Design a protein with these regions (language model features):
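Phosphate-binding glycine-rich loops and their immediate beta-loop-alpha structural context
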Residues: 129-242
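Short Gly/Thr/Asp-enriched flexible loops that form oxyanion-binding sites at enzyme active sites
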Residues: 249-260
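Solvent-exposed alpha-helices and their adjacent loops that cap or buttress functional pockets
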Residues: 49-51, 60-63, 80-84, 97-99, ...
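Phosphate-interaction motifs
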Residues: 1-164, 324
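Short glycine-rich anion-binding loops that position phosphate/pyrophosphate groups of nucleotides
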Residues: 63, 94-95, 181-182, 245-251, ...
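Flexible glycine/proline-rich
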Residues: 4-7, 20-28, 32, 37, ...
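Short beta-strand segments
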Residues: 59, 90-92, 121, 145, ...
Length: 395
């Protein structure tokens, strides 16, 4: 299955099961959350005309080339008096323009005379260096649309408009579980044939960065009854996310439980790493099963699960930005699957890690993104390739 088809299917499933519950949170708690309703301006920005420069405010008609006396000083945060006819006002950046003034001359183009009057050295124009009322935003204008993920810029804009809290989509509740007798949690001694459970830490941290509420379901027991019990306790989550794969073998208790109390589809994705992917439901709860090799987990979560979770919160644009970068490597073997090579940019070119095995998480720690190599292509050094930064996938 092409990755585009898998994504299309997952997004359709997400659209059919949106998270509709919302809550109000303070701006300080809204980072990474999804706005639940349109944010509409309740005031003009700026609320009044103000100065864009440190300088002098005046009425253009009062200036005939002669120096003007300074009648007041206006600082940001202070209300000015109406401008006296035939005078100017010392004004500072962001301060309200006094009634009657219609332009500001920057202080660099003004000369203060011995008697305190100000001589303007350059021609003046109506409205120069003045920020008009409502220049940025007018009352009633849509400022941030529903379905927007809130970052520092959006939160700063909301604060500028006076919002102390925002209506956001409830956090997705995601249960993370691992499968595999070989897995041991870090800190415990390893037995023969065992490895530490790195995927759990990878996914829990990633989900938290995405604003999810994570339920750590641990490692599934090697027992069907206990697997049923574990899954049955996850009925209040929005997604069950497993790693380790689901097979058709008799010892695959997760697969058996899904088949008897839900539905299960095994997708063979035409990507590398990350060929096997599972989607199903257990007693109505969506289940996504990611491949167990760490690099495969990273790629399939970033390209498929992350968009699915964002779409369920109402985010429309869920795919990562892609950038065209010159290749600093040769990839001579054309594959039948789309490949995602762990890579990083150095000196204006993208270079790949020496070992692209799906079991090598160190390749991703070294990298700052992945190169997307299309099926049947053999990019050579200097060719333009597509690069997806981890910054587009992890946040």
């Amino acid at each position: 299955m092409p990755v585009e088809e898998a994504l299309e299917r997952l997004l359709a499933l997400a659209d059919a099961a949106p998270i509709t519950a919302t809550e109000k949170v303070a701006l300080a708690a809204a980072e990474g959350r999804v706005l639940a309703c349109d944010l509409v301006a309740g005031l003009d920005l700026p609320p009044w005309p103000n100065s864009a420069m440190d300088g002098y405010a005046l009425r253009l008609a009062d200036w005939q080339g002669e120096p003007l006396a300074v009648s007041q000083r206006i600082f940001a945060g202070h209300a000015p008096q109406p401008l006296q006819s035939g005078t100017c006002a010392r004004i500072f950046t962001g301060a309200p323009l006094p009634e009657g003034a219609d332009c500001v001359e920057m202080q660099e183009n003004a000369q203060v005379m011995d008697d305190g009057r100000v001589h303007f050295l350059e021609p003046l124009a109506l409205g120069q260096n003045v920020r008009p009322k409502g220049q940025e935003t007018r009352v009633g204008e849509l400022v941030i649309g529903a379905g927007t993920r809130l970052g520092p810029i959006q939160l700063g804009l909301a604060a500028t408009l006076g919002f102390a809290e925002l209506e956001v989509v409830r956090r997705p509740r995601v249960a993370v579980l691992s499968t595999g007798d070989e897995l041991v949690e870090p800190g415990l001694p390893l037995g023969p044939g065992q490895i530490y459970n790195s995927n759990r830490r990878l996914l829990v941290s990633w989900l938290q960065r995405l604003g999810c509420e994570v339920v750590d379901a641990g490692i599934l027991p090697d027992d069907l009854a206990r697997t049923r019990q574990c899954l049955g306790g996850l009925g209040d989550v929005d997604l069950i996310l497993s790693t380790g794969g689901v097979s058709v073998g008799e010892a695959d208790y997760l697969g058996l439980a899904l088949r008897e109390a839900g539905e299960l589809a095994l997708w063979k994705l035409a990507i590398k790493p990350g060929k096997p992917l599972t989607f199903g439901h257990y007693q109505g709860v969506p289940v996504i099963g990611l491949p167990g090799n760490p690099a495969s987990t990273l790629v399939t979560f970033g390209l498929l699960t992350r968009p699915y979770l964002l779409r369920r919160q109402g985010v429309a644009k869920v795919e990562p930005l892609r950038f065209s970068v010159p290749a600093g490597f040769d990839w001579p073997k054309a594959g039948t699957r789309r490949e995602y090579l762990r890579a990083r940019i150095e000196d204006g070119q993208v270079h790949i890690y020496k070992n692209q095995s799906s079991g090598v998480l160190r390749s991703a720690a070294w990298a700052d993104g992945v190169v997307e190599v299309l099926e049947g292509t053999t990019p050579q050094q200097g060719d333009v390739v597509t690069f997806i930064p981890f910054s587009e996938l992890l946040g």
